[in-house]
């Protein structure tokens, strides 16, 4: 699995305190029911980042099937409760 990073997506997820390493960790470690297809051709994954921190990552697949992360953030308290079930 290859990832494509540029200034835009690295800076965008950094605003939420997520590193490219963590986003990749969440996507690579995805377990059912993730990744989930959401609107258009976007994919959603909930998983654990560095230190077990629960994160949400949204990505698209480029024409050459590289993963391009478009959003990442920590889960909210409500989402964390749902994720633990």
Predicted regions and their residues:
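Ribonuclease/tRNase effector modules and their secretory precursors
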Residues: 1-85
């Amino acid at each position: 699995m290859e990832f494509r990073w540029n200034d835009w997506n690295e800076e965008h997820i950094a605003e939420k305190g997520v590193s490219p390493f963590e986003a990749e960790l969440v996507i690579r470690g995805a377990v059912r029911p993730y990744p989930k297809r959401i609107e258009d051709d976007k994919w959603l994954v909930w998983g654990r980042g560095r230190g077990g921190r629960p994160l949400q990552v949204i990505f698209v697949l480029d024409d050459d099937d590289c993963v391009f992360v478009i959003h990442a953030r920590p889960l909210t308290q409500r989402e964390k409760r749902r994720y633990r079930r």
